[in-house]
Regions:
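Short, charged, surface-exposed secondary-structure boundary motifs
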Residues: 1, 95-98, 158-163
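Glycine/small-residue-rich loop that forms an oxyanion/phosphate-binding "nest" at active or ligand-binding sites
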Residues: 1-14
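Short secondary-structure boundary/capping segments
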Residues: 1-4, 22-26, 78, 98, ...
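Conserved catalytic motifs of the protein kinase core domain
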Residues: 9, 30-31, 125
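Structured adenosyl-cofactor binding patch, chiefly the S-adenosyl-L-methionine
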Residues: 12, 52-54, 68-70, 75-81, ...
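RNA substrate-binding interface of SAM-dependent RNA methyltransferases
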Residues: 13-113
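Alpha-helical structural signal
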Residues: 44, 126, 166-170
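Active-site/ligand-binding-proximal alpha/beta "capping" segment
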Residues: 107-157, 161
Length: 195
């Protein structure tokens, strides 16, 4: 019944809360994640947790990604898997089309040759498209993504794992949305004081 040595004394039976890609896209709000071939349950759980913490409304698991309800993924998500719209859609093309219909742009990370993530506007609704830990995004999926960014690094580190890079982008999106909202609020207060 459990895969841990000292489980909690609780048991439950529940149905999976999968939602169709179109419904997930509609629930995405300002931020969604599309995981393509992300196979490590720890990374996937980290991405679910970071997505929720940064205001994402949906995480779409596509093209061979780990089962979001795998025990290690659920634990790593700290329950976020139950609080965001989760889709096991299977097809990244369908997921991207649904997100585009819902008004979200698409953005992926690459190792080099793109602008730094902090130089790109992430305040508008965006879907972060994240690929396999070892191989990145498949070419057909990468070709459908509108923009790419890189995360500058120093030292000898070759790359970050997908959980870390996705988390950085989630919180950069949140930072930019907050900054935009604060500027808008400040502008509204100034307008209210004008005769």
């Amino acid at each position: 019944v459990t895969d841990t040595v000292t489980p909690q004394p609780v048991a439950a039976i529940a149905r999976f809360a999968d939602v169709p890609p179109g419904t997930a896209a509609a629930a995405a709000g300002p931020l969604a994640l599309v995981l393509v071939g992300v196979r490590d349950p720890g990374n996937a759980g980290t991405l679910l947790r970071s997505a929720e913490a940064a205001g994402a409304g949906a995480v779409l698991f596509c093209d061979g990604s780990v089962d979001p309800y795998a025990p290690k993924c659920v634990r790593a998500s700290a329950g976020s898997v139950f609080r965001v719209a989760v889709t096991r859609s299977g097809d990244a093309g369908e997921a991207l089309a649904c997100l585009a219909s819902a008004g979200l742009g698409t953005l992926a990370t690459v190792a080099r040759g793109a602008r730094s993530y902090d130089e790109v506007d992430l305040a508008d609704p965006v879907a972060l498209v994240l690929g396999n830990e070892a191989h990145g995004l498949p070419g057909d999926v990468a070709a459908r993504v509108e923009r790419a960014v890189t995360i500058p690094m120093v030292g000898r580190t070759e790359s970050l794992n997908v959980g870390m890079s996705g988390t950085i982008l989630c919180f950069e999106s949140l930072r930019q949305r907050r900054q935009r909202d604060q500027a808008s609020d400040q502008g509204n207060r100034l307008d209210a004081t004008q005769p």
